[in-house]
Every structure is written in C-alpha cells, then in structure tokens.
Amino acid sequence: MALETCFRAWATLHAPQPPSSGGSRDRLLLSGAGSSQSKPRLSVASPSPLRPASRFACQCSNVVDEVVVADEKNWDSMVLGSEAPVLVEFWAPWCGPCRMIAPVIDELAKEYVGKIKCCKVNTDDSPNIATNYGIRSIPTVLMFKNGEKKESVIGAVPKTTLATIIDKYVSS
C-alpha cells in the first residue's frame, strides 16, 4: 500500500516534570494500523497523575512514494516548479528497456519518499516535452533541481547509478 501521508507528532511540556522512580513517560499509541476496517487513531497515554497532559502539535503533509505521470498539462507545476529534486523517466509502452527500469524507479520513489519526486513522461503522449529536452533514446532519466536539468542518464542502468545521482542532489 502506498504511503499517502507522513505524520509527525511531538510533545511540548509546559510544566516541570517531577522525578519518577518508575521512569514513566507519555506513550504515543497508534491503534487500528493493522486493520483494514478502521482508520488509525492517535492517542496519548499519560500514566502519571502529577504530570500535566502534553500539548501535541501535528504536522501532516502529502508525500507521494510512487512514480507520478507528468505530461504537457502538469509539467511546469510538477517538475519545473517543484521545491524538491525531481527524477524524470522518459519512456514508451513499446520499449523493452523501459519496462526493465520501471521497477527500479518505483523502488527509488519509495526509498527517497519525502526527499525527491519521481515522475515519468510517456514520449508517445507528450512528444513536446521530449523534444524540448533533446530526448532521442529511451529510457532516458533526467534529474531536475530548482527547475533546471542537472543530469541525464540514457538506457536501463543499475539502481546504484541512479541512487548516486539522487544522493548528489538530495544532500546539496
């Protein structure tokens, strides 16, 4: 199942905590996570009556861990306007090597979730994008950062080759 949201929670205490011999701490409980019938719920268990309830600040953001289709309609917003680095695969349904590299791109999207975006452009459906970037062979993978093309790789390359490129732009 694709991860659709990233949830971070942290507690900010307002009162000093009395010393405790039992080492009790607030516990964050996530229930219903394994059940397909109920939505996960977040609750706080505060075992110490001397300790006031913590105030929780939550930050949720949509994070996509799968490869998203980019086309001529959404290219500017998805790739050129992205704050995160973007890995773009140019492919076609009839291309054998494209079918070989697709699972590699899927794995990278999951491994780098929240750090990069992964997109794919069908060159048959969006020939103008391919022409603008000089795509003459497929699969071709381009790396974009701040709306600029930074690197390109042609052919069905190993995962480590693409991961090395991604690491350059994620850490910079």
Curated annotation (Swiss-Prot):
Null allele phenotype: Semi-dwarf plants with pale-green leaves, abnormal chloroplasts, reduced carotenoid and chlorophyll content and increased hydrogen peroxide levels.
GO-annotated biological processes: hydrogen peroxide catabolic process; plastid organization
Transit peptide start-stop: 1-59
Site (Contributes to redox potential value) location in chain: 96-97
Pfam families listed in its UniProt record: Thioredoxin
Keyword Zinc-finger carried by entry: no
Domain of life: Eukaryota
Disulfide cysteine pairs (residue numbers): 95-98
Main location: plastid
Domain Thioredoxin: 60-171
Gene Ontology molecular function: protein-disulfide reductase activity
Family, similarity comment: Belongs to the thioredoxin family. Plant M-type subfamily.
Protein name: Thioredoxin M5, chloroplastic
Organism: Oryza sativa subsp. japonica
